[in-house]
Swiss-Prot record:
<feature type="region of interest" description="Inhibitory domain">
    <location>
        <begin position="43"/>
        <end position="69"/>
    </location>
</feature>
<dbReference type="InterPro" id="IPR026779">
    <property type="entry name" value="Camk2n"/>
</dbReference>
<feature type="region of interest" description="Disordered">
    <location>
        <begin position="1"/>
        <end position="21"/>
    </location>
</feature>
<comment type="subunit">
    <text>Interacts with CAMK2A and CAMK2B in the presence of Ca(2+)/calmodulin or after autophosphorylation.</text>
</comment>
<dbReference type="GO" id="GO:0005634">
    <property type="term" value="C:nucleus"/>
</dbReference>
<dbReference type="GO" id="GO:0019901">
    <property type="term" value="F:protein kinase binding"/>
</dbReference>
<comment type="similarity">
    <text>Belongs to the CAMK2N family.</text>
</comment>
<keyword id="KW-0649">Protein kinase inhibitor</keyword>
<dbReference type="GO" id="GO:0045202">
    <property type="term" value="C:synapse"/>
</dbReference>
<comment type="function">
    <text>Potent and specific cellular inhibitor of CaM-kinase II (CAMK2). Traps Ca(2+)/calmodulin on CAMK2.</text>
</comment>
<dbReference type="GO" id="GO:0005829">
    <property type="term" value="C:cytosol"/>
</dbReference>
<dbReference type="Pfam" id="PF15170">
    <property type="entry name" value="CaM-KIIN"/>
</dbReference>
<protein>
    <recommendedName>
        <fullName>Calcium/calmodulin-dependent protein kinase II inhibitor 2</fullName>
    </recommendedName>
</protein>
<keyword id="KW-0539">Nucleus</keyword>
<dbReference type="GO" id="GO:0008427">
    <property type="term" value="F:calcium-dependent protein kinase inhibitor activity"/>
</dbReference>
<keyword id="KW-0963">Cytoplasm</keyword>
<keyword id="KW-0770">Synapse</keyword>
């Protein structure tokens, strides 16, 4: 197994025409790329019973009962 050595300033490379000029420091870290490459593959498609079903919605309107009762009593006009 390979040995991991501590990172030091001596190991950093210098860039530009003048190596003694301004320093450009950077660090490179490995990140978990599984989620990047997986994309939508990790998300499963919905089951047949779940298609078209909305999540529970809470309606906070005091007039909703009157509106719902009024819709059942009146036939649609102009249709």
């Amino acid at each position: 197994m390979s040995e991991i050595l501590p990172y030091s300033e001596d190991k950093m490379g210098r860039f530009g025409a003048d190596p003694e000029g301004s320093d450009l420091s950077f660090s490179c870290r490995l990140q978990d790329t599984n989620s990047f490459f997986a994309g939508n593959q990790a998300k499963r498609p919905p089951k047949l019973g779940q298609i078209g079903r909305a999540k529970r919605v809470v309606i906070e309107d005091d007039r909703i009962d009157d509106v719902l009762k009024g819709m059942g009593e009146k036939p649609p006009s102009g249709v």
